Amino acid sequence: MDIISALPVTIVFVAVFALIQIPMTVAVGLRRLQTDVPFMDGGDSVLLQRMRAHGNFTETVPIALLAMAAAELAGAPHVLLWSGGTALLLGRLVHYATIVTTGFGTGRAIGMLLTLSSLVLFPGFVLLKTLGVAV
């Protein structure tokens, strides 16, 4: 069995998140060039916002995708995978946009709630399935 047939939903989200990370990485790099700050943030608030938005993305997305893959391998229904993956995607986009624009606000909280919902949903399914609870 190949990865596409084993993880048909997760693999789509892996590809989408990988592509989304490219402009985030480029935004940090471009700001570094503009400010001549090769390391850390140099006291530049815009660079710091971009770094943290990118950093938060890279801190949360990989573990969420691993949990999603585990849920898919454990037999999670596609509706659960698509809804959890979409919540993660929307959550990360809203959170990123809020951090790089204002840094604070309702969008940031909504983004984290959507992200956390997938971080509860996927491993929750796996644990229930592992414990033999009907899901």
Describe these PLM feature segments.
Residues 26-52:
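Cytosolic, membrane-interface loops and tails of multi-pass inner-membrane proteins
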Residues 56-68, 119:
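Core segments of transmembrane alpha-helices
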Residues 64-65, 71-100:
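Mid-chain, well-packed structural core segment of small domains
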Residues 8-36:
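N-terminal signal-anchor transmembrane alpha helix
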Residues 124-135:
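Juxtamembrane boundary at the C-terminal end of a transmembrane helix
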Residues 1-8, 46, 50-56, 72, ...:
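Juxtamembrane loop-transmembrane helix junctions in multi-pass integral membrane proteins
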Residues 94-120:
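Interfacial loop-to-transmembrane junctions
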Residues 17-20, 24, 87-95, 118-125:
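Membrane-embedded alpha-helical transmembrane segments of multi-pass integral membrane proteins
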